[in-house]
Amino acid sequence: MDGAIIGIVCKNDNVSEPDDDTTIKEKTYPEPNWIKWPAIKKPNFSHGKVLSDIRTHIDDGGYYNDSDLITAGHETTHGINSVIRNKFYQGKPTNAFYCLEDRAIILNEPKTRIEVVAREVPRSLRGGVYDLYLVQQAASGWGDRALYLCDEWVSYT
């Protein structure tokens, strides 16, 4: 299956930059674990294709229903991601993301913290959600789960 690999790049203060034109080789990572995550109920297309797709992949008893359809899609995606993450947990920090059309990806959490990622965001790019996702959530217990930021991104898209 074709797909993009998302990377969180953090500056490592313990590594010095070369003084010449030496090429720094990129680290190669294993191919992410794409899985099939089939629908568990029939779609109701009254809210459109994407929200219908999302809603067919969780049995939440209506927990994530919201009159604002964007909020409903966002929160339901978080719920699906959580179900997948918990199902495939094998004792090491892992995250999972539902990517529509019965596709999901499972990734190992990188060995970095959200606070480290936050320091690398230029002040000029720190918009309205910066404090919520990169400061408050990091302090609330998600700090060692840098892929939480991808969970938010996937849930908004």
Model-derived regions: residue spans:
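Pan-zinc metallopeptidase signature
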Residues: 2-4, 157
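Generic detector of short, aliphatic-rich beta-strand segments that form the cores of beta-sheets
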Residues: 5-9
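Extended, helix-rich scaffolding/adaptor regions
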Residues: 10-58
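Short pre-active-site segment immediately N-terminal to the catalytic Zn-binding motif
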Residues: 54-71
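Active-site recognition of the HExxH zinc-binding catalytic motif
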Residues: 70-86
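Post-HEXXH active-site segment of zinc metalloproteases
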Residues: 83-127, 131
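Mature extracellular/secreted ectodomains of secretory-pathway proteins
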Residues: 115-157
